[in-house]
Amino acid sequence: MKYNKTLALIPAILLAACGGGDKQSIDEKPRPGSMVYSFPMDGQADVSPKADIVLRFSHAITDDEATLQNKIILQSSGQSQPFTVTLIDSGKSLKLEPANPLATGEEFTVTFQEPLAAEGGRQITTPNATGDDGIQFATRGAYAGLAELANTADTFDIAWQVPASDSPFQAMNFSTFRFAMTQPVHPEWQSLGGSIQLRDASGQEVPATVLVKGNRITVDPCVTPEPSQCGSKQDILNTGETYTLQLTNLASLTDSSEENRFTGEFTFTPRDTGPTVVLQQTAVDSGNGELTSVLNGQALNAVTLNSVLQGEAGPSQQTGDLFAELAYAPAFDADEALPLRIPKGSVLKSTSLNVLVGGKVQVLDAATGEDQQTGTIKVTMLSDASGYMSPNQYTDDINAPRHITLFMDVSMNTEAAQPNAALSQDLMGVELRGIALVRDGVLTIDAIGMVEPNLLGQEFTDSTIAFHLQAATDADSVLDAENLRELDATPPSLVSWMPGPANAVPATRQSMQRPGDPIILFFDEPLDPASVENGVELIENGAPVTNLQARLDGTALVLNPQGGLKHGVPYSVSVDGLTDLAGNRAMVSPLSFELDSIEENGSPGNKGFPLALTTYPGYPCETDYENTLDLENGVFGKCWTADANNAGDVLPVSKMPADRPITVVFSKSLDLDSVIVGETFTVQEIAQEANGTVTVLNQQVAGRLEKNNQRIRFYPEQPWQVGAHYRYILASSEQSGTCTPGQYTSICDEDGIPLKTDLLEGLNDGDGNNGPDNLEIVFTGSEARSTVFTPLRNLPIRDTNSNLAIDCDDLGSESCLEPFNHQGSDSEGFLPSANAAKLLVTQDHAEDARVGCAVDGADCPRKKFIYQTYALNTEVIGPTVDPDTGRDAVKVLLYPTQLATTSLDVHLSLLSTVSSTGPQVLRMRYAKDDPECTGASCARNSLIPGYITENDQGETIFKTKAELFLDAPGLKATASILGIPTDLPLTHNLFGYPFTLELEGRVVFFDDGRMQIEQRNFNVPHIDVEAVALGIINTEIPLIIPEQGVYLNFISNPVKEIPAQYE
């Protein structure tokens, strides 16, 4: 038979295979009813826990929804799961929506405890395709990173693979090989000694794209000389030759020990698929949602992303053509699955979306001030999508539709820079399950698939897509559409990058970069992983970095040298050889940046000390809880302070959601070797006896530690038990030798200085010889939350090296290590710079005292500021209404923490006294449980509420009200007595001094995906300092923070990261 005649048979073969014809006949004989499709399919694994269950029948169901809810049973481990039922397509489909997300890593069964009634008096009993009666499916492991939740088995192994010799899905000469593992693969699997290779019969390695992410592995052979031809008809393995796929020494993320490594070898002999034919399949437009899926009732080919951070974003209408290569049907028996593939590099585009916070508050483009749009959304296939058209598994009826199974690895990105950075990523193992029918010469595919993108690196979202594809197969259509597919000839273009150029919006982005933060390049299309190793270079101070780590995720290339970037060193990123999937070479000019310096010629000699800026869960102060701890009632203790009474509130015992890691952020880069699980970092399970004694039930909770230069995360092996109590301890000592390598007794920074936990007691509370000052934090396990934990850092800061001092000979100097850089003038005064606060003496005492300089001289507008070092954790709750304005808003809760600041001098006219505060501490107070409560006895256990909303100018803003304590444990006074500077013994009231800040400011979204929140005060807090010198000299200094005198600047974490160490 000649080839062109073979092709001419394809439409007729498709008609027969898909249960239809140009004029589909109707069998007059009544047929029994049956189920013909389900999502998930019977036996499907790695199903999203947020999936709805869809059932499709041969005939319309006549039971009402209430009856169906009683007849249909959804179970897991013998427990029924509540759900609602919706009739779709006049009853031919049912959608079951679970009341709550399904548990991860669990098996579920759908059965009918009574037959369902269908049209014509038919009865439809419990369906079955494989295994036990009913539809059996298993949900995926959790993305939380905790071993018990992420793993689907105790050992690292293959959970399932496709193709597989023992399944209907056999290896073909155009197959792509996919593996789902029982545990997530370690991101550094290659540097840990792992390898993945495909070899031919002679042992030679076969060129292939290897993709690894989460628990998924894909090996996509490409044997054509040109990358653009990957997935074409020429890209096939040799039929009849034996190939071997080797997975060697692969490490698991949750247990990378040698004992848990995976090694496996798989041999296969690919089956011939030729002569193949390519069909052009078109994604049908839903007409603004008018056309809906017969399977689940959703708009056809429409993408809606469900999340807390962006609300319900969509629908975005998918458009475009896919070119599916089908195997030669006559070579396959009627009961065999007919293989197909869609070539690597295929693209589906979706229409632009408006970007909102929480689905309610408009995001603005930082550069233009216009409403932020995504621009065209693209989904690009990173490997050949491979699938099968199979006989219907639920019924033997020859008129039933065929089943479609399609596996894809895709990259998603957007046209506009900010949403591109927020969404760009690889989505591995996307699985479509659907049905295929031919009607009037048109092959029609209806399928359901789910994707779960990680938004902003903070939240796993979900989207269910109802695909509807059509391909004409009649005599007038193109017999083979291979030549209609346009090949990509456009090189990739850089859209944005982090930290960004010197003129980025805002211009301070390079000053916000810290060791541990990566460099991220965001392109407009995915890159070829094979081009990364030699296609990009990081130049440090004129020399190439030899230990550069690189990761590719979607269109984002993430770079970080081992040990992190360094302060005060010029860097340049050189791109020379990066290509897209088709081999087109990127052209990018060198990207230069530099982190702010933290020292000059070895100065300052005062290196400061590392502080715990945020502790999650908990409050970052050394706590006195021996006589106050009450675990049952959630009472912890008070921060130790230099005041004899430990001024301040009693802190609550924090609640910790079951699936979250302990996270601690530090002010300086750590000596990561000093963070030792079970020694300097301990996590215990505890209990409290009736007499108040604390008992340690587990000396060290099993888990893994993820270290970055200025942050650590501890993931417990098992979820925190609801109602169980825990304590974690960060070791700190002021004893000499505590930071000796190999003999650490403290967590230490890179300068060999131990963690300081007791700043509230002063810079030196024991002359360097007062033993341990461990930071101990107690918490209680609680249920997992659906809200989004969003950590923030306060950058940029003038005190770049975080030593709580400004390293300049003069505070107003602009030519020093940490130069003065404020808006304003010496004549008119200055506004605070980012993360600074301005203090003034009240006007009625201007002759008695002045901030920064002597009362009898010229004023000093540059010396009226303190500079803060801190971080902040937040919880994004979701849509609400601004209680002040009634406008749409998104509620955000703030976790209280403490801020460290530089010193401030206040000069008095009396005896020319200079009062120096020393480093100060601002403590955020927990909110009142009852906002209407007044007085000192009000219970304070609640997080601080805030709101993202719009102001009268249409700008996105954040507003909150924070109650604080001010502590100045090092406050001292120096007087001029007979012309001699003399220190005066001093008592004062700056211990737990309460005041309130009412804050508001813009929310700005960077083109690298990060969010910036500016906060300025619009009230005028009074701080009335009362001091007694020598026991007899009473002094009052009435200070104020003027309106707009506080400027706080928060930024969210980078959207991608490369941890420095995993343990």
UniProtKB/Swiss-Prot annotation:
The record's section on InterPro entries has:
Cu-Rt/internalin_Ig-like, SbsA_Ig
Mind listing the UniProt keywords for this protein, alphabetically?
Cell inner membrane, Cell membrane, Lipoprotein, Membrane, Palmitate, Signal, Transport
Q: What name is this protein filed under?
A: Alkane uptake protein B
Sites of S-diacylglycerol cysteine lipid attachment are: C18
Mark the residues modified by lipid (N-palmitoyl cysteine): C18
Residues of the signal peptide: 1-17
What organism is this sequence from? Answer: Marinobacter nauticus (strain ATCC 49840 / DSM 8798 / CIP 103578 / SP17) (Marinobacter hydrocarbonoclasticus)
Q: Its topology with respect to the membrane?
A: Lipid-anchor
Q: Is Lipoprotein there in the keyword field?
A: yes
Query: Principal place where this protein is found?
Result: membrane
The entry's function note states:
Required for growth on alkanes. Probably involved in the uptake of micelle-solubilized alkanes. May facilitate the transfer of alkanes from the outer membrane to the inner membrane.
Q: Gene3D superfamilies recorded for this chain?
A: 2.60.40.1220
